[in-house]
């Protein structure tokens, strides 16, 4: 483990994220203006594709960070069995789950049951497939549905808040199964499927259409749902972060596109692969 990741073990991750959340939610003119303008300059953020194209149009940094796209800014792949990217970002890893193990980085894997915080769900997806999409700070930070499905359960899993990037993925064991996350489970034409929204350092929160903003707790919290989504529908959003993981069962027989590999830049709605019903 390198110095950068080692230091993160000793900083007060939750407190830092809590303070960041308060500042990001502030509507004080000086606070929001300073944060928004500094961030936009640091990450060369363009508002050309967004509904509100002035930095002054946002009520807080959170409002800016979760800014909405213009209608038709993204094309949702319409192929019947197509699995699309849930977010703008970069493919961190994708492929098959082998005997409960997903690839995190070269030479490092982690357990699907630990990711989902449920051993029975882990067994169900033991030989399925997955795609991990990392959202960079400058990306559009809403998460959309990669397939049609009915949301049946959400599971909030408390955890650490390591930053998420190539360095931590390569150095922090079980990174995605250790960080705070929200597991969303769906009934689909392929059986049960999941979208996991993973938090990170300074991530101020996770919100979904079904749950509203998730309240942080010390215990796993589950809720049952019965909400239908179409591919491309908004599922939720990150306040300052991080990673979305799509998980499909073995029965889906997912065939990922040859062009999709580690480091591929993707947009929400772009075809990642195809499943079979």
From Swiss-Prot:
EC number(s) given by UniProt: 4.1.1.65
Chain positions of site Cleavage (non-hydrolytic): 241-242
Record bears the keyword Cell membrane: yes
PTM annotation, UniProt: Is synthesized initially as an inactive proenzyme. Formation of the active enzyme involves a self-maturation process in which the active site pyruvoyl group is generated from an internal serine residue via an autocatalytic post-translational modification. Two non-identical subunits are generated from the proenzyme in this reaction, and the pyruvate is formed at the N-terminus of the alpha chain, which is derived from the carboxyl end of the proenzyme.
Modified residues (Pyruvic acid (Ser)): 242
GO BP terms, alphabetized: phosphatidylethanolamine biosynthetic process
Keyword Lipid biosynthesis: yes
Function: Catalyzes the formation of phosphatidylethanolamine (PtdEtn) from phosphatidylserine (PtdSer).
Protein name as catalogued: Phosphatidylserine decarboxylase proenzyme
Lineage: Bacteria, Pseudomonadati, Pseudomonadota, Gammaproteobacteria, Moraxellales
């Amino acid at each position: 483990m390198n110095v950068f990741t080692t230091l993160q073990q000793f900083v007060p991750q939750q407190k830092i994220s809590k303070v960041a959340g308060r500042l990001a939610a502030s509507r004080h003119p000086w606070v929001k203006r300073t944060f928004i303008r500094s961030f936009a300059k640091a990450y060369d953020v363009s508002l050309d594709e967004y509904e509100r194209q002035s930095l002054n149009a946002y009520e807080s940094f959170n409002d800016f960070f979760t800014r909405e796209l213009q209608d038709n800014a993204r094309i949702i792949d319409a192929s019947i069995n197509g699995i699309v990217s849930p977010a703008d970002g970069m493919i961190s890893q994708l492929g098959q789950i082998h005997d409960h193990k997903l690839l995190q980085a070269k030479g490092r894997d982690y357990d699907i049951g630990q990711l989902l915080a449920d051993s029975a769900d882990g067994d169900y997806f033991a030989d399925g497939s997955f795609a991990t999409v990392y959202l960079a700070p400058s990306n559009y930070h809403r998460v959309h549905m990669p397939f049609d499905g009915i949301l049946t359960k959400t599971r909030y899993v408390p955890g650490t808040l390591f930053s998420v990037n190539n360095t931590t993925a390569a150095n922090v064991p079980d990174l995605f199964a250790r960080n705070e996350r929200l597991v969303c489970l769906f009934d689909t034409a392929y059986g049960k499927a999941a979208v996991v929204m993973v938090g990170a350092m300074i991530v101020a929160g996770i919100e979904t259409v079904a749950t509203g903003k998730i309240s942080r707790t010390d215990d796993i919290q589950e809720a049952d749902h019965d909400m239908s989504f179409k591919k491309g529908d908004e599922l939720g959003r990150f306040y300052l972060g991080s990673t979305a993981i799509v998980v499909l069962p073995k029965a889906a027989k997912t065939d990922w596109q040859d062009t999709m590999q580690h480091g591929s830049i993707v947009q929400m709605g772009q075809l990642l692969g195809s499943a079979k019903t």
